[in-house]
């Protein structure tokens, strides 16, 4: 419970809310939340999907007062008490948060009033999700126009690790929950496009707030295509990336294979096992993941080459399950890199020949970036 002297005001400062990453108690219906939400948002709806649809139909046919009356009849008694209790607990757990609905209107106001009747004063976001969303898109467009450098290199070069290690790095693949290749999906589902964009804006705002400690800051991003799995990059960011200088990481095949072995065969198998609990189910899901990654590019490989690699993959999977040994995967992964992924990336890199600013191994690129782009004051 907050006393009047401690009451926090409602906020219309969407930029500050996104930058700070405050918790939002989002009272929109689940279907709205699934289409797009802000980082830190918790969906505790005033109305479920069916209730919202019924109230919306009533509003169109009979007007606002009739729709409001229907809403109160639908969210009544035990249903109302259960939702109030969920909001109360969320307010206690997140005392610095805000209520949020679609436009900062009736739904967040009703929840705020109901909470106030229980002695809980909790502020709302004026303008709601719509204002936050617009601020997020504007921020991404604005910040995307700042200087940047891309990290390029063949699969397994350690590009993502470099991005994550640098103070101005934005991990686009991490935000998208996808690593960009046919084997790129993770166990975390990809976000809706709007949610991906909102998380990207929040990451850029949060990182940019720390740029004052750097003498010559640039964004550091992995050299991506326009799509990362099902998510596409915002247009302005994509346009700037197409013109940005590129630092190319050149690592020997053996080192790349070791990175990929750890990430795709050791860590992914453990992740499937942890997620599913049952050992047999974990192995089936992990096997399906590897099978699908290779199957997705079968036409580009050619069916004969695909069949050859698939047989090697199956043998490596059987060996891994039997002995725990993962190096057998190199029998299909090495030719896949050398015959498919590497030529494809080199072809793309040739188009950017004039943009290449530096070449070196992982540690050389790291040192070059830190010296030229991320030097501390």
From Swiss-Prot:
UniProt keywords, alphabetically: Selenium, Transferase
Residue intervals of the Rhodanese domain: 18-141
SUPFAM superfamilies in the record: P-loop containing nucleoside triphosphate hydrolases, Rhodanese/Cell cycle control phosphatase
UniProt xrefs under InterPro entries: P-loop_NTPase, Rhodanese-like_dom, Rhodanese-like_dom_sf, SelU
Superkingdom classification of source: Bacteria
SMART domains the record matches: RHOD
Assembly and oligomerization: Monomer.
Name of the protein this chain belongs to: tRNA 2-selenouridine synthase
Enzyme nomenclature, EC number: 2.9.1.3
Coiled-coil residues: none
Known catalytic reactions: 5-methylaminomethyl-2-thiouridine(34) in tRNA + selenophosphate + (2E)-geranyl diphosphate + H2O + H(+) = 5-methylaminomethyl-2-selenouridine(34) in tRNA + (2E)-thiogeraniol + phosphate + diphosphate; 5-methylaminomethyl-2-thiouridine(34) in tRNA + (2E)-geranyl diphosphate = 5-methylaminomethyl-S-(2E)-geranyl-thiouridine(34) in tRNA + diphosphate; 5-methylaminomethyl-S-(2E)-geranyl-thiouridine(34) in tRNA + selenophosphate + H(+) = 5-methylaminomethyl-2-(Se-phospho)selenouridine(34) in tRNA + (2E)-thiogeraniol; 5-methylaminomethyl-2-(Se-phospho)selenouridine(34) in tRNA + H2O = 5-methylaminomethyl-2-selenouridine(34) in tRNA + phosphate
Catalytic residues in the record: 101 (s-selanylcysteine intermediate)
GO annotation terms (biological process): tRNA wobble uridine modification
Family: Belongs to the SelU family.
Cited function: Involved in the post-transcriptional modification of the uridine at the wobble position (U34) of tRNA(Lys), tRNA(Glu) and tRNA(Gln). Catalyzes the conversion of 2-thiouridine (S2U-RNA) to 2-selenouridine (Se2U-RNA). Acts in a two-step process involving geranylation of 2-thiouridine (S2U) to S-geranyl-2-thiouridine (geS2U) and subsequent selenation of the latter derivative to 2-selenouridine (Se2U) in the tRNA chain.
GO MF annotations in UniProt: transferase activity, transferring alkyl or aryl (other than methyl) groups; tRNA 2-selenouridine synthase activity
């Amino acid at each position: 419970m907050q006393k009047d002297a401690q009451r926090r005001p409602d906020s219309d400062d969407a930029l500050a809310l996104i930058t700070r990453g405050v918790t939002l108690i989002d009272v929109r219906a689940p279907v709205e939340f699934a289409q797009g939400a802000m980082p830190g948002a918790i969906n505790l709806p005033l109305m479920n999907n069916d209730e919202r649809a019924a109230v919306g139909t009533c509003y169109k046919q009979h007007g606002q007062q009739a729709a409001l009356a229907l809403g109160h009849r639908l969210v009544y008694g035990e249903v109302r008490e259960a939702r109030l209790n969920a909001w109360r607990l969320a307010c206690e757990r997140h005392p610095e948060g805000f209520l949020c609905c679609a436009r900062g209107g009736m739904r967040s106001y009703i929840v705020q009033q109901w909470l106030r009747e229980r002695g809980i004063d909790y502020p709302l976001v004026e303008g709601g999700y719509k204002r936050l969303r617009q601020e997020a898109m504007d921020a991404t467009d604005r910040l995307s126009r700042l200087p940047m450098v891309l990290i390029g290199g063949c699969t397994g070069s350690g590009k993502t690790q470099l991005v994550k290690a640098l103070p101005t790095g934005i991990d686009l693949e991490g935000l998208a929950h996808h690593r960009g290749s046919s084997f790129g999906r993770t166990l975390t589902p990809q976000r809706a496009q709007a949610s991906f964009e909102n998380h990207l804006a929040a990451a850029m705002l949060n990182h940019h707030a720390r740029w004052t400690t750097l003498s010559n800051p640039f964004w550091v991003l992995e050299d991506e295509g326009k799509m990362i799995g099902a998510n596409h990059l915002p247009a302005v960011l994509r346009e700037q990336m197409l013109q940005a200088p590129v630092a190319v990481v050149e690592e020997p095949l053996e080192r790349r294979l070791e990175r990929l072995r750890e990430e795709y065969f050791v860590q992914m198998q453990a992740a499937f096992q942890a997620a599913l609990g049952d050992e047999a189910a974990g192995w089936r899901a992990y096997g399906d993941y590897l099978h699908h990654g290779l199957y997705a590019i079968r036409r580009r490989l050619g069916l004969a080459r695909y069949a050859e690699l698939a047989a090697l993959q199956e043998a490596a999977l059987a060996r891994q399950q039997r002995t725990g040994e993962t190096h057998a995967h190199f029998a299909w992964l090495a030719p896949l890199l050398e015959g498919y992924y590497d030529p494809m990336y080199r072809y793309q890199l040739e188009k950017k020949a004039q943009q290449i600013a530096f070449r070196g191994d992982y540690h050389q690129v790291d040192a070059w970036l830190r010296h030229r782009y991320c030097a501390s004051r």
